């Protein structure tokens, strides 16, 4: 079980994370290097040393961002891809085994509220389709999850560049990228794990190509090797009513292509609105127990984190990344796994 940590500026300390039963690994990254630059080996080594001094392990990076010029397929992408490959080598040399990344144009995860109040008084991240439909990014209006490093005119120019990039072009650019980096990842002993689009649908006319079962199947076929794998995020994919997360885990888990599991719950409305809930199955639209069983049945040996959490018990900090609810989620997931391991006598694929 792993836990995301945003470095020394994170209000959640490594000391507190270490106290969560069953949490052994930290998921982190180098946050002060510009996108597209090589992550220096000495910074990676220093991060690893900090984590290990706290009695935890560092084997998963989330994320190494992909420069927009690579997604756009611009002429300068080869230099940026070379930088990405060198970062993979540095991470592999430091003992990192999985790198999570995404291929979402312009915007990373998108939410319309960071602190929606739930019936129990806790607050959560939420997404409203109507709110997004009323927004024109060209007007300079921002939403949570957007890259704040873009000035309004820069964002407008970037969006203009994507007007000529449809799904087919984005697929071609992802294929070019994967064929360039996966052989290096294999040599470095690293598995790449692409994260689904969040939410799993086009927004603002931008193409999205990591949103459902067919997209995931196409991605793993582009370079058909275990080093080209998935971060299967139940919350991101589960926000799309068409996605059967349990079935996705069974299919791609049986293939050995899920290297990183983000397990969290969401409550999804018929119109596509959703809010992030407690991990417990009854709190949201996903059967978390069935999802965890699917991982168990397919012999999953990768990395897991509870992903996001609500803000509870008066905690403040980075929305979605407080200590308390994520800790509850980690313990809940570990409890499900322990029960399956001890009492489910159905052989897993790993023992058949």
Curated annotation (Swiss-Prot):
<dbReference type="GO" id="GO:0008198">
    <property type="term" value="F:ferrous iron binding"/>
</dbReference>
<dbReference type="GO" id="GO:0008927">
    <property type="term" value="F:mannonate dehydratase activity"/>
</dbReference>
<keyword id="KW-0456">Lyase</keyword>
<comment type="similarity">
    <text>Belongs to the mannonate dehydratase family.</text>
</comment>
<dbReference type="GO" id="GO:0030145">
    <property type="term" value="F:manganese ion binding"/>
</dbReference>
<protein>
    <recommendedName>
        <fullName>Mannonate dehydratase</fullName>
        <ecNumber>4.2.1.8</ecNumber>
    </recommendedName>
</protein>
<dbReference type="Pfam" id="PF03786">
    <property type="entry name" value="UxuA"/>
</dbReference>
<comment type="function">
    <text>Catalyzes the dehydration of D-mannonate.</text>
</comment>
<keyword id="KW-0464">Manganese</keyword>
<comment type="pathway">
    <text>Carbohydrate metabolism; pentose and glucuronate interconversion.</text>
</comment>
<keyword id="KW-0408">Iron</keyword>
<dbReference type="InterPro" id="IPR036237">
    <property type="entry name" value="Xyl_isomerase-like_sf"/>
</dbReference>
<dbReference type="InterPro" id="IPR004628">
    <property type="entry name" value="Man_deHydtase"/>
</dbReference>
<dbReference type="GO" id="GO:0042840">
    <property type="term" value="P:D-glucuronate catabolic process"/>
</dbReference>
